[in-house]
Amino acid sequence: MRKRLLAVLLIVCVMAGMLYLGNENEYVGKEEEISTLFRDKETIYFWYSDEALTDFIASAAVAFGEEKDVRVIPVLTSDSEYLEALNQASLHSTQIPDAFILSNDSLEKAYLSGLASRITDEAGICNEEHFPGTALSAVTYKDKLVAYPYYYETSALLYNKTYLEAWTAEQLQKVAEGDGEEGMDDAGEDAADASAADNADASATDDTDASGEMEATEDTLTVTPEQIAAGIPANMDEMLAFADNYDAPENVEAVLRWDVSDIFYNYFFVGNYMVVGGECGDDETAVDISNEAVKQCLQVYQNLNQFFYIESDSVSYDSVVQDFIDGKIVFTIATTDVLTKLKQAKEEGTFPYEYGIAMLPGPSAELQAKSLSVTNCVVVNGYSEHRALANEFAAFLTNEYYDNLYERTGKVSANLAANAGNEDLQVFMEEYKHAGSLPKMIETSNFWIQLEILFSKVWEGEDAAGLLQELSDRITTQLQ
């Protein structure tokens, strides 16, 4: 225990003196002092740019240092010109960043500049036993694993479970009374089918479930989780049918509202059919932007504005989440951070509802959804003189020290074994498994800004086919 306390104190003292590097001169000025302090043990420097990770990385550094009898010095660096700072420190400092966290879309630039190197993966963790294919593709460049997957972000469907449960009960009651099937929408029919199956099971077991609670009787009707799930729209056709038939509570302003100004929450409409860089995002020949399926998806997207009337210049992700907390909307598109916001609202007493997370709806019954994802990874610096130890720490961080990563940092581990007991995060993981990744190609670094502009214009009624062709021509030219 005494050794652990001394190690923590030592790390804190170092971090207080030099962790945040406001400029290169300040960092270089600390080099001699730090080198003297840690000359007794092999030492590696670990860079990151997100302050939310500070306490967690410091704890991981202490744990790994004690296990291996080495020193890991975390270095928080401004994310402004992060790669350039890494490059300068690698070329001109005696304290080279041995490993660092980087978004997958910057891996080509890092690899070509020598900052990223092929990982050794001595622990044998970079496989589908430990990470989904999406994560492995994200850290692959030109058929080489050049990083370890660490944490990810993607989007999923967030719904007000309280509202949906009440609506499902109404649908089931109509079926029970024999007067609601004719006008029932697709989602309602699914809920009714689930009800019939559940009630049949209930009859076969004396009308009780495994816990002894009554499933259905003449006087009461209990809605099961399966029936609620059956009522969640699987595509936008079902979403529109739901909206047409939904008898909304007084404070509900919209059935569906999301941030239509941000490509991260729009991409799922076209993600399954738009190709930029191939599976690993590094193939200049794999580009297919303007095809019939993408055009159909964008037409669906454009038509939704006629139904949901979302003003792109006045909506934001934060405003949508607040509307959801206030009970003004039934469904929205959200990223993993929403779980923390809802938990906080619950604790403050401002969110009196239950909620659920589901897979994103397809654009139509025939067209499939595919969300966008970003994978932050741990890179071993090609300039490092301690690459073996840096690889060990990267493997430790991504495959051993992931417990409570989300609770302490808000970041969701890409490791399949993480968050096993969190149902909401497991749904996000399922979405991540099927998601597309940001491409790594330097020439397409502005693609997402251009695609976001395209979505904005399509939402406002401009010709989708023409805009797609313009974007396709522009990206093709950039890659030549």
Predicted regions and their residues:
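Hinge/lid segment of periplasmic solute-binding proteins
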Residues: 102-156, 167, 182-186, 190-193, ...
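Ligand-binding clamshell of periplasmic/extracellular solute-binding protein-like
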Residues: 46-50, 72-136, 149-159, 230-240, ...
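Short, solvent-exposed loop/beta-turn-alpha elements that line the ligand-binding surface or hinge
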Residues: 120-131, 229-231, 276-298, 346-350, ...
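Short, polar/charged alpha-helical segment
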Residues: 50-72
